[in-house]
Curated annotation (Swiss-Prot):
The gene is panC. Belongs to the pantothenate synthetase family. The reaction proceeds by a bi uni uni bi ping pong mechanism. Catalyzes the condensation of pantoate with beta-alanine in an ATP-dependent reaction via a pantoyl-adenylate intermediate. (R)-pantoate binds at Q60, Q152. One of its GO terms (molecular function) is ATP binding. It is found in: Cytoplasm. GO terms for biological process: pantothenate biosynthetic process. Its EC number is 6.3.2.1. Keywords: ATP-binding, Cytoplasm, Ligase, Nucleotide-binding, Pantothenate biosynthesis. The active site is at H37. The keyword Protein biosynthesis does not apply. This is Pantothenate synthetase. ATP binds at residues 30-37, 146-149, 175, 183-186.
Length: 282
């Protein structure tokens, strides 16, 4: 496995692989890897080569968010990549990614102003800008992203289409802890009491899925049922609960096919997200 920190060296390695007609699966991460990331790596191994990038992107954090405290453990991450058959770990620093007079950004007029985008101003501009750069540097064939960041997946798919990137975005299922909590690098922030309270988030998701399966169409009733579960936990403060069209992120009144049910909530000071998808509904 190659551990590369230089953009120039990463581009040269990719160029060599491409000259031998090798396909590339790419997993973008901010590090502090967990089983959710490793499931993406496993999916990426259908390609000839697998690249994992580790970069805590300052551009996608707001002024009062957790950039400085975001969990980091490079040595552990590199070992996990090595143990799981990754071919290249790319770890650039911010000085390389954003040169002194950096002034070019990728932004979007729609989709990014809903859900997390409405709450985290500038977040998706940071995400799109850094991923556009990574796509140019690493030239992947398929990019593997987790459904837990569902809005991000849709935003990036739109960027790929709009800017004619020659790659495919593959969305992979949410990976959960045994008790149901969606795996997240930020779970490490939770105290024992907060960790217990956080289960209300996944419980609200599972209840909503059950209601949809039982035929409930009224989104206001589903949202209220989710709200009731979350409000029972004193440590939880709801950021949003929404049911939206998965492609447009527009709110809907009645359940149909291709709907995203999404929750964001603060457990203590930690903001967690979770969601479910309604697909294949007849």
């Amino acid at each position: 496995m190659e551990v590369i920190t230089s953009i120039k060296e990463a581009k040269q390695t990719v160029k060599n692989w491409k000259s031998h007609n090798l396909s590339i699966g790419y997993v973008p991460t901010m590090g502090f890897l967990h089983d959710g990331h490793l499931s993406l790596v496993k999916n990426a191994k259908t390609q000839d080569k697998v690249i994992v990038s580790i970069f805590v992107n300052p551009m996608q954090f707001g002024p009062n968010e957790d950039f400085s405290s975001y969990p980091r453990d490079l040595e552990r991450d590199i070992k996990m990549c090595q143990d799981n058959g990754v071919d290249m770990v790319f770890i650039p620093d911010a000085a390389q990614m954003y040169l002194k007079n950096f002034s070019t950004y990728v932004d979007m007029n729609t989709i990014t102003d809903k859900l997390c985008g409405a709450k985290r101003l500038g977040h998706f501009r940071g995400v799109c800008t850094v991923l556009a750069k990574f796509f140019n540097i690493l030239n992947p064939d398929i990019v593997y992203m987790g459904q837990k960041d569902a809005q991000q997946c849709v935003v990036v798919r739109h960027m790929v289409d709009d800017l004619n990137f020659d790659l495919k975005i593959q969305i992979c299922p949410i990976i959960r802890e045994e008790d149901g909590l969606a795996k997240s690098s930020r779970n490490v922030y939770l105290s024992e009491e907060e960790r217990k309270a956080s289960l209300a988030i996944s419980q609200s998701i599972f209840l909503a899925e059950k209601l949809v399966q039982e035929g409930e169409k009224d989104t206001s009733k589903i949202i209220q049922a989710m709200k009731d579960i979350l409000e029972k936990e004193k440590l939880i403060k709801i950021d949003y609960i929404e049911l939206v069209d998965f492609n447009t992120m527009e709110n809907i009144k009645n359940i149909a096919d291709n709907v995203l049910g999404a929750v964001a909530a603060f457990v203590g000071k930690t903001r967690l997200i979770d969601n479910f998808l309604v697909q294949g509904l007849k």
